[in-house]
Regions:
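Conserved acidic
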Residues: 1-326
């Protein structure tokens, strides 16, 4: 059970609602529409670089990636860093548009795919089963480009990844075109980070709502206090504080010690901290290299807690943080 194809004409698989207003993105759409891809070899089948609003964004089979210049970006009284991610982006593109491998009945495939998505929503992220369902959802897309898999259909793979990139860029373009003073920070496979004037937060949310209605997808929003940016794959994001009860506060402090915590006037709050790429050190998966963890920990302490590296190194007596694997 597999679907083999010869040539995929990309113009035939682009969603009808995809449209842009800027010259840069109209050229991108024209470029994608002109592609005819060898279905037997999708890897490296399309690459495109686009410069827009002083940020270079890269497109390819692996997704869309773009980042502003490296630096530390912080929210203040006038500006706020907004992060908006699409909920289970690639799986939901297939579910909402009723896409399936050519050899599967569409309704049965999409209904079962949606069942896994809905089951995952019922499980807290702290529960390992949430991660299991995440892998099931994401690997189903990935296996559509694996000839050894019974999900194999290169057109489905290309349909999801190209429409995913174009759809996300519609949101990115509208934010940048319609919000005066908006600053692009990150564009990744399933979301965008943008610094905008606080006075335009309602406009930002309206743009996101319009996008959700057009695409039938959902966005999850966060606000960052600070974004320490090296590149699109390596950064630290410090969210705003969230108030919780003392029981939840203690639970989160135990499971996520790298978050920020505070108690003021008997109010308990925490600020999630996202660690990506080489800055990550918390609960690394078994296949990840745990060598020299003292380095990302020292960087974290410096940028998040204003602790000088020499002071942190003097205080950190955990010998495992200094070990190097062979």
């Amino acid at each position: 059970m597999r679907t083999y194809r010869d040539v995929i004409k990309v113009k035939d698989i682009i969603l009808p609602y995809i449209e842009f207003t800027s010259t840069e993105f109209q050229l991108l759409l024209n470029r994608f529409s002109s592609l005819e891809v060898n279905a037997g070899s999708l890897k490296g089948s399309f690459k495109y670089n686009l410069s827009y609003k002083d940020v270079k964004t890269h497109f390819g089979l692996g997704g869309v990636h773009g980042a502003a210049s490296k630096g530390v970006y912080e929210s203040d009284d006038k500006m706020i860093i907004m992060s908006s991610d699409v909920t289970s982006f690639y799986p939901n593109l297939a579910i909402k548009n009723r896409w399936s491998p050519g050899h599967f009945p569409k309704d049965e495939f999409c209904d079962q795919y949606e069942w896994f998505f809905n089951e995952r929503k019922k499980i807290p992220k702290s529960n390992p089963m949430n991660y299991v369902y995440k892998i099931i959802l994401n690997s189903t897309f990935g296996l559509s480009n694996d000839e050894k898999s019974f999900f194999y259909d290169p057109e489905l793979c290309l349909r999801i990844t190209i429409n995913g990139q174009l759809t996300l860029m519609m949101l990115y373009e509208q934010i940048m075109e319609r919000i005066p003073g908006a600053i692009a920070l990150l564009q990744n496979t399933d979301g965008v980070e943008t610094m905008i004037p606080r006075e335009h937060i309602n406009l930002y949310m309206d743009i996101c709502k319009d996008w959700e209605e057009k695409t039938n997808l959902n966005l999850e929003h966060d606000e960052y206090q600070k974004l320490v940016l090296a590149d699109v794959n390596n950064y630290i994001g410090v969210n705003n504080y969230v108030d919780v009860d003392i029981t939840k506060w203690r639970e989160i402090k135990q499971s996520q010690p790298h978050y920020l915590f505070k108690v003021e006037n008997d109010k308990f709050s925490f600020a999630p901290v996202k660690l990506k790429g080489r800055f990550d050190f918390h609960n690394l998966q078994l296949h990840k290299n745990k060598s020299k963890l003292v380095i990302p920990k020292a960087i974290y302490q410096y940028f998040v807690n204003d602790l000088l590296p020499e002071q942190y190194l003097d205080e950190n007596k955990n010998i495992l943080d200094y070990c190097i694997g062979g």
